Amino acid sequence: MSGKKRTASSSRWMQEHFDDHYVKLAQKRGFRSRAAFKIEEIQEKDKLIRPGMTVVDLGAAPGGWSQVAVKLAGDKGKVIACDILPMDPIVGVDFLQGDFREEKVLDALLTRVGDAKVDVVLSDMAPNMSGTGGVDQPRAMYLVELALDMCHQVLAPNGCFAVKVFQGEGFDEYMKAVKEAFKTVKTRKPDSSRPRSREVYLVATGYKL
């Protein structure tokens, strides 16, 4: 019994230490969230965003990914962000608050994109977790399916897509759908992603539909 308690305690300590490290690092670098390190690491490996690009950031609040994206896209680039939660303004980011699952919010987002094709779609969306896998997983998969639908509507030929997906029911089918739409798909687990989390990031390049 004591062994089990000790294991749980050690695991909890590791998690807290891990979180504390990235939270402190985010504060030091002026990032709004530790999630900024995830897109930084993906960018370092996959070079998704370049100066002058147009980027859509779904599930953007509190703004960690948008901070990184706007810096990479530069003055001639464009970052359009959306979240159901409010987000403090970021210079160079066009933010729309609303529920991406609603048609009117999607329409408003498409209006902001305009006629220009998008180079990169980012999605760090996740549902409010209930702790019940049978409820949470379908909700999470619905969001990533909407993000892929967004790619089909706005992404330029050879465009890129980075999306957070939770491993579980529906993951394999979703991976297949992404592979059908892009030339290359890689699975990333950034160092800043919590070790025990089921989240992974699919990084897809070369949009071909």
From Swiss-Prot:
EC number of the protein: 2.1.1.166
Protein localization: Cytoplasm
Catalytic function, reaction form: uridine(2552) in 23S rRNA + S-adenosyl-L-methionine = 2'-O-methyluridine(2552) in 23S rRNA + S-adenosyl-L-homocysteine + H(+)
Binding site for S-adenosyl-L-methionine: 63, 65, 83, 99, 124
Catalytic site: 164
Entry keyword DNA-binding: no
Keywords carried by this UniProt record: Cytoplasm, Methyltransferase, rRNA processing, S-adenosyl-L-methionine, Transferase
InterPro entries reported in the protein's UniProt record: RNA_methyltr_RlmE, RNA_MeTrfase_FtsJ_dom, rRNA-MeTfrase_E, SAM-dependent_MTases_sf
Enzymatic class: transferase
Primary location group: cytoplasm
Pfam families (alphabetical): FtsJ
CC terms in the record's Gene Ontology section: cytoplasm
Disulfide bridge map: none
GO molecular function term, any single one: rRNA (uridine-2'-O-)-methyltransferase activity
Family: Belongs to the class I-like SAM-binding methyltransferase superfamily. RNA methyltransferase RlmE family.
Cited function: Specifically methylates the uridine in position 2552 of 23S rRNA at the 2'-O position of the ribose in the fully assembled 50S ribosomal subunit.
Identification of the protein by name: Ribosomal RNA large subunit methyltransferase E
Gene this chain is encoded by: rlmE
